[in-house]
Amino acid sequence: MTLVLTIRLLTSADIPDIARWVAETPLWQHYHVTENSFAKRLSDGLANGATIFVAEDNKNVLGFLWFVERGAFNRSAYVQLIGVRPDKRASGVGRELMQFAEARATSNDIFLLVSGFNTDAHRFYQRLGYSQIGKIDDFVIAGTSELIFRKQLKKE
């Protein structure tokens, strides 16, 4: 079945479902994310004017993207967080969200961090044209490295 995605801004009504499936995901569990902590993080983001999008199909939220226009070095676009519902991974949702972020970016490049152990994500971003340009040890939690990925964008 082909998904027909709509990307729109996150609303408070989206938060409970997203927080539930994020908390059930091993990657997020590695970072000690709970349903309550993630719901609070999204709610706080909304309250503080963060730019958070959701991808939905037939009114079902399948993924989210937290985008910061000048979030890297106060000049470049930054994907702060991205997540896809576990049963919709490898369905094109993540790719659509990343292409959406790239199209929104006004800078000539876009950055993101990826868990060092998340090799599936490394391959995903590399297929989209991102390159690993660095590594930060113990940045989010002790014992876990975050890899810095960057893509140069062709902006007119």
Feature-to-residue mapping (PLM):
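Conserved active-site tyrosine of GNAT-family acetyltransferases
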Residues: Y125, Y130
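Acetyl-CoA-dependent GNAT
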Residues: L5, L9-R89, M98-F100, R104, ...
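Residues forming the Rossmann-fold NAD(P)(H) cofactor-binding site
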Residues: R95
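Glycine-rich phosphate-binding loop
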Residues: G92
